[in-house]
Amino acid sequence: ATYKVKLVTPDGPVEFDCPDDVYILDQAEEEGHELPYSCRAGSCSSCAGKVSAGTVDQSDGNFLDDDQIADGFVLTCVAYPQSDVTIETHKEEALTG
């Protein structure tokens, strides 16, 4: 399946289609959008965003705890879309601050 991903960035919103077997960060880059990242392995907070609508599968990541995930935080480098999804990007400071 392919879902619509909307990223709400500091520069404004961007939208693109993302297959459910491609990480959102990877697809965003493929579409020409630059997002923050560091490890690309789900073990840091550089790429953190916050899901405001929809669902993702980020079971490949291990940095976020259950409370952070429950609050909507997502690591875009290990997140597969599970529905049409809206994510606010550049949330590392909100997560770690």
Curated annotation (Swiss-Prot):
Binds 1 [2Fe-2S] cluster. InterPro entries: 2Fe-2S_ferredoxin-like_sf, 2Fe-2S_ferredoxin-type, 2Fe2S_fd_BS, Beta-grasp_dom_sf, Fd_pln. SUPFAM superfamilies: 2Fe-2S ferredoxin-like. One of its GO terms (cellular component) is chloroplast stroma. It comes from the Eukaryota. [2Fe-2S] cluster binds at residues 39, 44, 47, 77. Keywords: 2Fe-2S, Chloroplast, Electron transport, Iron, Iron-sulfur, Metal-binding, Plastid, Transport. GO terms for biological process: electron transport chain; ferredoxin metabolic process. It is found in: Plastid, Chloroplast. Its main location: plastid. It holds the Pfam family Fer2. GO terms for molecular function: 2 iron, 2 sulfur cluster binding; electron transfer activity; ferrous iron binding. Its cofactor is [2Fe-2S] cluster. Residues 3-93 form the 2Fe-2S ferredoxin-type domain. NCBIfam families: fdx_plant. Belongs to the 2Fe2S plant-type ferredoxin family. Ferredoxins are iron-sulfur proteins that transfer electrons in a wide variety of metabolic reactions. This is Ferredoxin. It comes from Lycium chinense.
